[in-house]
Amino acid sequence: MEQINSNSRKKKQQLEVFKYFASVLTKEDKPISISNGMLDMPTVNSSKLTAGNGKPDTEKLTGELILTYDDFIELISSSKTIYSKFTDHSFNLNQIPKNVFGCIFFAIDEQNKGYLTLNDWFYFNNLLEYDNYHLIILYEFFRKFDVENLKAKQKKELGSSSFNLKAADDRIKSINYGNRFLSFDDLLLNLNQFKDTIRLLHESIDDNFVKDNKLLLDWNDFRFLKFYKCYHENEEYLSLNSLVTILQNDLKNEKIFIGFDRLAQMDSQGHRLALSKNQLTYLLRLFYSHRVSADIFSSLNLSNTELLKADNNSIPYNVFKDIFYLFQNFDLLNQIFHKYVTENNLNEQDIREQIVTKNDFMTVLNAQYNKVNNIIEFSPSQINLLFSIVANSKENRRLRKRNQDRDDELLNDHHYDSDIDFFIHNEYLHGVSRSRKNLESFNDYYHDLSDGFDQDSGVKKASKASTGLFESVFGGKKDKATMRSDLTIEDFMKILNPNYLNDLVHQMELQKNQNESLYINYYFYPIFDSLYNFSLGSIAGCIGATVVYPIDFIKTRMQAQRSLAQYKNSIDCLLKIISREGIKGLYSGLGPQLIGVAPEKAIKLTVNDFMRNRLTDKNGKLSLFPEIISGASAGACQVIFTNPLEIVKIRLQVQSDYVGENIQQANETATQIVKKLGLRGLYNGVAACLMRDVPFSAIYFPTYAHLKKDLFDFDPNDKTKRNRLKTWELLTAGAIAGMPAAFLTTPFDVIKTRLQIDPRKGETKYNGIFHAIRTILKEESFRSFFKGGGARVLRSSPQFGFTLAAYELFKGFIPSPDNKLKSREGRKRFCIDDDAGNEETVVHSNGELPQQKFYSDDRKHANYYYKSCQIAKTFIDLDNNFSRFDSSVYKNFQEHLRSING
């Protein structure tokens, strides 16, 4: 845990947020110290004080920044101000009033000042780092009253020698929640004070219906409470561990019992106690509006199903409990669907379109992995209820869409956001092509959101389900609500996950931030990306050229001779060179070769990558013809370096053959050759060079790509295939691809070589490509066009194998940001994560910007809102009246706390 005075980046970000929302403390608001060490803490009246002229009244300001109650609420709830480009998180479909965050403010306000200092703010951020932050803040809230009582007792008995100060001091001290030896069993709350605090909450809430019907939770009536009490110095205490257990178990049952007991009436027809639909909806809103989707309350219609022995006017206790049982296990059902999605590798479209029947649902529930994991069972009645709720919700959305009636749907009105609309109609239409697919994906989600999640998922892939054995046994005759055959996975997730829609919006926030970053730097990105590919291509080219240079040397000697008088074949050439010139002779001209091959191979590899990316279609596919065009373009672009390189290299490689004829020519250096030829001479034979390199690359690169795909099952776009190859596989694919490309282009290589060297005495001088072809056919034979063909295959095949293998390995070892994305291509899946804070990056197959998985928050962005919602839910779980906590209730609590210590 970081210290409060830490200067880490995280603390600087926290300070930035604090300053953005903070107000300036005034002299009237600052706490005043008194002689006994206690504080007189007046209420903060105004956080933005101004003088009569409308400007800040500097005489009243202390310069200290603080967060008032309103500042803190605004900070937590208005994430749109800093972090979000789209929404203020109003897409959360469970209802958590923002004023409930005042409970957090009260809990972390040290010394009950009425405002938060910077240290208080840092302390709050530190608490959020703990796994059980919501329980810790709940404990701090109630502990404040215990501490004030202890201080009052200490103040009263300060002069008494019989007063044991140690016990009081230990309770007053701040708690190190990072202590790994700390147990929740050691964190105690005075039970009587705890009850008084709950009673104070009830007194502060003005709800006559709740009070008249005795729906308030009275802790004095809880029979189970005696089993959780512990005693210290003759007083009753409740440990935090016990309180958590009560929250998870006993309190849920008490709420159900009290709610039904207080509102149920005798049904004369069914001869049983029952609730009406309105009473049921009221209790659900009262106890579970913060936990479930708001759409559920309008989807509880029991009159359109005959599989449940209840209707809207008579809902018995067992159906009432079944509904609450479902609510309590929505998270589990949500995880089951996630597991199903993961096991079947479903994508977003599948989730929108795949049909879920009761038979499918039962198959998933009864799967062996669920049984092994002790997935709890659901009764037929509970499953019928679930399908009824989901079906009613879908039907309601369909009717709302048909009638275009949004006046009665406050949530739906709020789902339309002008910022999203602006983004679609501006950046989407004028965005760069690199982000096009990402923006189109964004546009698909936008239509769902702007319709207020009213989109009726079409059934495209799955056919209409037939009635199976399960339906026959449990369903009887057809049932309109529970036997629908068009309910999709998405329909269930909208009910089971109250943040379903907000997760989609949050994903868009991340996408838009990333897209903005891309647009800002877009003009520089191709430069850096090309430099990256150019550098790696240069290194890889040098490695490949060095490995096969002796073979290239022999190939050139064989192509240069016009008869078999000197070298009979490649082996004979190799032996004679070694005997006359030594091993060193095989590397004559390597220096200029390395100087030129770096940019040559770099240009070829970079242009090929560039063209393949440009010609890839929207689905991430590249057909054969664009592959050929990409390779041909790469071959054409490399000639600007290849031709000067080749002519100097070839002349150095054959110069020893001129020893007996021209001593000066036999001893020329690379520099002298360049000066002698001049710029124009360096491009002799450029047409022949193009005729060789363009078809070579047009053959080589598509062949290499298809060998990787067909021979080694490599396809990063297909998650069922491999997305990475071993080194030997890359070498093999590169070598095999080089064989046909090298051999078929050998005639053009022979012509180029002949044009780029000076003829020996008695040999015909070629005047151009066609003259060279006619002369070779006349003086030699057709076979001469394939001189050195074997050596060329042996040279080109491994050279490009080594070059491309090195290139791809270097891209893996030294990844650019873009390649980091590509290294995880095709892994588009939904994952179950026990930690909701963890993120799962989803990458498009063409290396586009990453997306965050739908069903979790994102730690790269501030989570104040999400974590504060979790804290607020814990308070409301304890007592639903915390949902009405506001500034007036806060003042009552603050005044009561001050009154304890006089």
UniProtKB/Swiss-Prot annotation:
<feature type="repeat" description="Solcar 1">
    <location>
        <begin position="528"/>
        <end position="614"/>
    </location>
</feature>
<feature type="transmembrane region" description="Helical; Name=5">
    <location>
        <begin position="731"/>
        <end position="751"/>
    </location>
</feature>
<dbReference type="GO" id="GO:0043490">
    <property type="term" value="P:malate-aspartate shuttle"/>
</dbReference>
<keyword id="KW-0813">Transport</keyword>
<dbReference type="GO" id="GO:0015183">
    <property type="term" value="F:L-aspartate transmembrane transporter activity"/>
</dbReference>
<dbReference type="GO" id="GO:1990816">
    <property type="term" value="C:vacuole-mitochondrion membrane contact site"/>
</dbReference>
<dbReference type="GO" id="GO:0015810">
    <property type="term" value="P:aspartate transmembrane transport"/>
</dbReference>
<keyword id="KW-0999">Mitochondrion inner membrane</keyword>
<feature type="repeat" description="Solcar 2">
    <location>
        <begin position="622"/>
        <end position="710"/>
    </location>
</feature>
<dbReference type="GO" id="GO:0009058">
    <property type="term" value="P:biosynthetic process"/>
</dbReference>
<keyword id="KW-0812">Transmembrane</keyword>
<dbReference type="GO" id="GO:0015297">
    <property type="term" value="F:antiporter activity"/>
</dbReference>
<dbReference type="GO" id="GO:0005739">
    <property type="term" value="C:mitochondrion"/>
</dbReference>
<dbReference type="GO" id="GO:0015292">
    <property type="term" value="F:uniporter activity"/>
</dbReference>
<dbReference type="Pfam" id="PF00153">
    <property type="entry name" value="Mito_carr"/>
</dbReference>
<feature type="transmembrane region" description="Helical; Name=4">
    <location>
        <begin position="681"/>
        <end position="702"/>
    </location>
</feature>
<dbReference type="InterPro" id="IPR018108">
    <property type="entry name" value="Mitochondrial_sb/sol_carrier"/>
</dbReference>
<keyword id="KW-0496">Mitochondrion</keyword>
<feature type="repeat" description="Solcar 3">
    <location>
        <begin position="725"/>
        <end position="813"/>
    </location>
</feature>
<keyword id="KW-0029">Amino-acid transport</keyword>
<dbReference type="InterPro" id="IPR002067">
    <property type="entry name" value="Mit_carrier"/>
</dbReference>
<dbReference type="InterPro" id="IPR023395">
    <property type="entry name" value="Mt_carrier_dom_sf"/>
</dbReference>
<keyword id="KW-0472">Membrane</keyword>
<comment type="similarity">
    <text>Belongs to the mitochondrial carrier (TC 2.A.29) family.</text>
</comment>
<dbReference type="InterPro" id="IPR051028">
    <property type="entry name" value="Mito_Solute_Carrier"/>
</dbReference>
<keyword id="KW-0677">Repeat</keyword>
<dbReference type="GO" id="GO:0005313">
    <property type="term" value="F:L-glutamate transmembrane transporter activity"/>
</dbReference>
<protein>
    <recommendedName>
        <fullName>Mitochondrial aspartate-glutamate transporter AGC1</fullName>
    </recommendedName>
</protein>
<dbReference type="GO" id="GO:0015813">
    <property type="term" value="P:L-glutamate transmembrane transport"/>
</dbReference>
<comment type="function">
    <text>Calcium-dependent mitochondrial aspartate and glutamate carrier. Transport of glutamate in mitochondria is required for mitochondrial transamination reactions and ornithine synthesis. Plays also a role in malate-aspartate NADH shuttle, which is critical for growth on acetate and fatty acids.</text>
</comment>
<keyword id="KW-0106">Calcium</keyword>
<keyword id="KW-1133">Transmembrane helix</keyword>
<feature type="transmembrane region" description="Helical; Name=1">
    <location>
        <begin position="534"/>
        <end position="554"/>
    </location>
</feature>
<feature type="transmembrane region" description="Helical; Name=6">
    <location>
        <begin position="786"/>
        <end position="806"/>
    </location>
</feature>
<feature type="transmembrane region" description="Helical; Name=2">
    <location>
        <begin position="591"/>
        <end position="611"/>
    </location>
</feature>
<feature type="transmembrane region" description="Helical; Name=3">
    <location>
        <begin position="622"/>
        <end position="642"/>
    </location>
</feature>
<dbReference type="GO" id="GO:0005743">
    <property type="term" value="C:mitochondrial inner membrane"/>
</dbReference>
